[in-house]
Amino acid sequence: MFESYYLEKGKEASAMLRAQTVMKYTSEMGDYYYNVGVQDLTAGLDFIQDIEKDHSVYFLSSNLYDVDNNELLFKDHVILDRNGLKVGIFGVTREIQLDAKNIKTKDYVVEAKRKIEELRPQVDILVMLLNATQRHYQSHLNEFSDADYIFTSLEDAKTRPEVEQPIGKPFEYKLGIQGKNIGRCDINIADKNKPIRDVSSQMMMADIFSQRLSKLQEKDPKKKIEDIYKNSPNVLATVERLRKGIESANSVLNNTKNRSSFTFIPLSRSVASEKNILKEVDKVLDTCKKLDEKGLKLTS
């Protein structure tokens, strides 16, 4: 929810208002489940619990406990039913702020293994949300092998969707930390007893190669592409290569029963916005600017 694990002096009010606004509007878009991580507790435990009460927002954590009573602070998992497919989701974080004295962080590896063992028999697809950097969790990936998907936050680098995920291991996706993209994962299951194959690279190939062919065709839409470039053997060789690539990609897509694909959607100005929401967000940003000006004056 926050850009950092601490609140910048003088900008506390605007940071909290931004976080509240994000939670408010995402809650109106559907069911969102958030793994509680170090950058969600920036404004303290009460702040995040109040957001959960005020909006239809769902926070998950399997390893954050109340120091006093040793009870979980958030729902530790959820099982969703999507067209007869049971999807289990749970989340863990490696660490939180050192000054969060009322929160106990249990070992995320131990708790993740416990949740995987508990949920695996109950679900068709098991999703693990992990708030940690790759250098901390990489050596433990084999211990999470019974999960189907691992989505990580806190890592600077993002997953390259064009690199195919290996069959037989959890599909691992690093979402980055800057909030400039939304990661989207689509899953199509036809046979629960067969493995899932990542077809992101094939989908990208078919799409990009088709676009390149269309671009070549634009020179003269009324002619066959072979006639347009009959005197350009190098271009014709490229056309043949693009067609074979599309054919190969479509063959995989058509013959894969259980498909999974992942892509990043850039949050640029080209993304269509709901006008009413955009209007409200602009108001909030204007308010944040004023709050920052006021806060910085008070701290100077």
Predicted ranges, named:
Residues 1-300:
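Acidic, metal/ion-coordinating pockets
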